[in-house]
């Protein structure tokens, strides 16, 4: 069984030679995490009419094969978050991806870090759900190699939902 306990994973992305984004494993119960989750929930509610909280709990991040991360700017301020949690032994689900858009490239930095971490944890596929109406998210995932799949799990039969998958190589 893979455990991230004791691992010090850290990725730094430098954009345009100026902006630094650091992504690392974090505490989903921290005040920084809570603040970003609330910002994400408000944004989702404004876009879709649903804050997305019903399909995610921070408690789920206690699983050995789950991971919660924060992205921080060069001043150390949390500007984005994301998570993976197990669906099966080989498939993880991408959850609560968010950037406050104060720094360009946060979404890409988070996604790259989570995909690389998922591979290290033994996952071979990542899945996710978003809403058709969330055009930015749909476009972002397509641009990053995710393909449309049949709705799975709690999203089966939900016409407002769209699901994506990516094989990790």
Q: Could you say what each language-model-derived stretch is?
A:
Residues 2-31, 169:
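Conserved N-terminal entry element of GNAT/NAT acetyltransferase domains
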Residues 8-15, 55-58, 151:
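Intrinsically disordered, low-complexity boundary segments flanking structured domains
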Residues 21, 29, 69, 124-127, ...:
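C-terminal "cap" of GNAT-fold acetyltransferases
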Residues 21-95, 99-102, 111-112, 117, ...:
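Acetyl-CoA-dependent GNAT
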Residues 102-103, 136:
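Active-site-proximal flexible loops/turns
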Residues 109, 113, 135-136:
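Alpha-helical macromolecular-interaction surfaces
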């Amino acid at each position: 069984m893979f455990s991230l306990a004791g691992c010090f994973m850290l990725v730094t992305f430098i954009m345009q030679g100026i902006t630094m984004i650091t992504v690392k494993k974090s505490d989903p119960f921290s005040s920084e995490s809570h603040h970003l989750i609330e910002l994400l929930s408000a944004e989702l509610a404004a876009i879709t009419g649903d804050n997305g909280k019903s399909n995610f709990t921070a408690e789920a991040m206690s699983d050995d094969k789950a991971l919660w991360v924060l992205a921080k700017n060069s001043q150390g301020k949390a500007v984005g978050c994301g998570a993976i949690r197990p669906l099966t032994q080989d498939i993880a689900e991408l959850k609560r991806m968010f950037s406050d858009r104060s720094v360009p490239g946060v979404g890409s930095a988070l996604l790259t870090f989570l995909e690389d971490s998922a591979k290290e944890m033994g996952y071979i596929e990542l899945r996710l759900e978003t809403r058709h109406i969330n055009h930015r998210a749909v476009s972002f995932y397509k641009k990053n190699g995710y393909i449309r799949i049949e709705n799975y799990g709690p999203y089966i039969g939900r016409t407002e939902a769209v699901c994506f998958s990516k094989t990790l190589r």
